């Protein structure tokens, strides 16, 4: 990975969206819900006022409209401020 977030930002690899429903109905790309969970793959150095509490490998939840989408090496990522992350999972 050669993307290094700056300041209090984190780079997240979103979890894959569901391909089909429990009943077996295939969901087209246009109807899929945006995932709200992902894995932290890179973190910034923090700021003078805010220390980074997230770590690479953390599974996190974030808001539906959080972050900026970007694509790198064929994968889609989100970059957002640490404060946009709502929770760390288990």
UniProtKB/Swiss-Prot annotation:
GO molecular function, one term: protein folding chaperone
Entry's Gene Ontology BP terms: chaperone cofactor-dependent protein refolding
Gene Ontology terms: cellular component: cytoplasm
Primary location recorded for the protein, binned into one broad class: cytoplasm
Domain of life, per lineage: Bacteria
Subcellular location per the Swiss-Prot or TrEMBL entry: Cytoplasm
Classification via InterPro entries: Chaperonin_GroES (IPR020818), Chaperonin_GroES_sf (IPR037124), GroES-like_sf (IPR011032)
UniProt keyword terms in alphabetical order: Chaperone, Cytoplasm
Task of the protein: Together with the chaperonin GroEL, plays an essential role in assisting protein folding. The GroEL-GroES system forms a nano-cage that allows encapsulation of the non-native substrate proteins and provides a physical environment optimized to promote and accelerate protein folding. GroES binds to the apical surface of the GroEL ring, thereby capping the opening of the GroEL channel.
Family: Belongs to the GroES chaperonin family.
PANTHER family for this protein: 10 KDA HEAT SHOCK PROTEIN (PTHR10772), CO-CHAPERONIN GROES (PTHR10772:SF58)
Quaternary structure and interacting proteins, as annotated: Heptamer of 7 subunits arranged in a ring. Interacts with the chaperonin GroEL.
The protein's name: Co-chaperonin GroES
Organism name: Phocaeicola vulgatus (strain ATCC 8482 / DSM 1447 / JCM 5826 / CCUG 4940 / NBRC 14291 / NCTC 11154)
Gene: groES
């Amino acid at each position: 990975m050669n993307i290094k977030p700056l300041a209090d930002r984190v780079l997240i690899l979103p979890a894959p969206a569901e391909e089909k429903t429990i009943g077996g109905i295939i969901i087209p790309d246009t109807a899929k819900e945006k995932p709200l969970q992902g894995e932290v793959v890179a973190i910034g150095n923090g700021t003078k006022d805010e220390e980074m509490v997230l770590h690479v490998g953390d599974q996190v939840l974030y808001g539906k409209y959080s972050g900026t989408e970007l694509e790198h090496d064929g994968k889609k990522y989100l970059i957002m401020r640490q404060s946009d992350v709502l929770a760390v999972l288990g």
